[in-house]
């Protein structure tokens, strides 16, 4: 009998347990006992994914393109994703009774749009397979004489032949984490940074737009006059700055950039999705066609009236002036703002952290098996490794994939 411990009852850990147990059903001579340890209810974190709808994955069948959605771990994931991609995840869940559908933006959700349905189906399968769950907080681990000794916070000790660490990220700032367990066993941990979080802006006009959302906005990250990357996504204004997919992507790609109030990160956004010259011609034509209308009314054809007023006020332009009276310099000023608007980011909104950048050093893990190169019998899966994806189902796909790889390898 091989006894396997999984520390972490999130998507990756439960996936690893299910696949490992399913794998033994085809091997009568291989007897396995699996126990999943977690201080919280299993798969509790799954309930808030995708706004409660559970964004299971992203429909990109080319694994070489899929890995490009991961700011960290791109090369490492090539082998795992070539073995278990989004179609494999869909098939896995279909066998458990969860039908899925693909949105226009390629995000994948269960037909029910209910994360709890996904949670329940995974827990039913785990129970059917005989996987045990133990609600305790693990505080330490040792490896000696071929077995792992796992300690909980009450100093109880559990003996296992193999160990899977699947504790997820650093959002809860727990004293006892998968990082500390991995480190105690000789693994290196890269710098941990918040990722996929909201951003705090210096500009006040953003805060006046709190609650306003815009679709498919193009952006460009700039720091110290150097372009980092171009990106796009929906944008949500908040009482402290910005949130939503565009902000989340920005926070991930700038996770290791040392920006602050005195040396802010710049997110250049293009509200119009057109180059300065192209939109200038369009807006001039619009003005000439509506000379007797107020400039507020003309701009309100592109934005809500309240947003248009806030933008004009910030630029020092009188929203009550007639469009036909707008001078060239003011038009150019407005067009530049709408196509090359610089938002100065002073810091991240830490309470909104969705994933953690950083984790167990990837060079110390075999990406074909997710097995430790340092400690025999030790495996990793999920966000505890130095892998993090953008918003859109990528991080859950990493959980399903890495959990699957561990399950068939252990």
What is each of the regions a protein language model found here?
Residues 5, 21-51:
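Glycine-rich FAD pyrophosphate-binding loop
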Residues 5-7, 35-37, 138, 157-171, ...:
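Short hydrophobic core segments
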Residues 39, 44-131, 137, 237:
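Conserved N-terminal/central alpha/beta ligand/cofactor-binding core
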Residues 39-42, 48, 56, 60-63, ...:
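An anion/pyrophosphate-binding glycine-rich loop and adjacent beta-alpha core
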Residues 134-147:
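A conserved short coil-to-beta-strand element within the FAD-binding core of flavoproteins
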Residues 135-136, 309-388:
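A glycine-rich dinucleotide-binding beta-alpha-beta segment and adjacent secondary-structure elements
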Residues 162-206:
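Glycine-rich loop(s) and the adjacent beta-strand/alpha-helix scaffold that form part
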Residues 168-181, 185, 386-410:
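A conserved FAD-binding loop/helix module that cradles the flavin
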């Amino acid at each position: 009998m091989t006894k396997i411990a999984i520390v972490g009852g999130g998507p990756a850990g439960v996936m690893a347990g299910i696949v490992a147990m399913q794998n033994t059903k085809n091997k009568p001579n291989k007897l396995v006992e699996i126990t999943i340890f977690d201080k919280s209810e299993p798969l509790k974190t799954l309930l808030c994914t995708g706004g409660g709808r559970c964004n299971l994955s992203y429909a990109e069948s080319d694994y070489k393109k899929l890995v490009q959605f991961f700011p960290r771990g791109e090369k490492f994931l090539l082998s795992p994703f070539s073995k278990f991609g989004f179609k494999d995840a869909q098939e896995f869940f279909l066998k458990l009774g969860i039908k899925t559908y693909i949105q226009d933006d390629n995000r994948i959700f269960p037909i029910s749009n209910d994360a709890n349905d996904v949670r329940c189906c995974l827990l039913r399968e785990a129970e059917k397979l005989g996987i045990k769950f133990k609600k305790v907080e693990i505080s330490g681990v040792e490896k000696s004489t071929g077995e792992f000794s796992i300690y909980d916070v009450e100093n109880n000790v559990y003996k296992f032949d193999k160990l899977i660490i699947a504790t997820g990220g650093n959002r809860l700032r727990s004293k006892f984490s998968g990082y500390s367990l991995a480190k105690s066993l000789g693994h290196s941990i890269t710098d941990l940074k918040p990722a996929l979080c909201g951003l705090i802006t210096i500009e006040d006009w953003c805060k006046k737009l709190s609650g306003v959302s815009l679709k498919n906005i193009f952006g460009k990250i700039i720091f110290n006059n150097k372009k980092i990357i171009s990106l796009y996504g929906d944008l949500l204004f908040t009482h402290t700055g910005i949130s939503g997919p565009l902000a989340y992507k920005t926070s991930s790609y700038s996770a290791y950039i040392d920006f602050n109030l005195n040396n802010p990160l710049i997110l250049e956004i293009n509200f119009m999705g057109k180059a300065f010259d192209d939109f200038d011609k369009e807006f001039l034509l619009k003005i000439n066609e509506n000379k007797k209308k107020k400039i507020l009314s003309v701009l309100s054809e592109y934005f809500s009236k309240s947003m248009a007023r806030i933008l004009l006020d910030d630029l020092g332009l009188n929203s009550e002036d007639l469009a036909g009276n707008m001078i060239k310099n003011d038009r150019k000023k407005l067009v530049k703002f709408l196509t090359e608007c610089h938002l100065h980011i002073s810091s991240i909104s830490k309470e909104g952290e969705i994933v953690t950048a950083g984790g167990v050093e990837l060079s110390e893990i075999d990406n074909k098996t997710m097995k430790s190169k340092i400690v025999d019998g030790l495996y990793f899966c999920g966000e505890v490794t130095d892998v993090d994806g953008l918003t859109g189902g990528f991080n859950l796909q990493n959980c399903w994939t890495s959990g699957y790889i561990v399950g068939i390898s252990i």
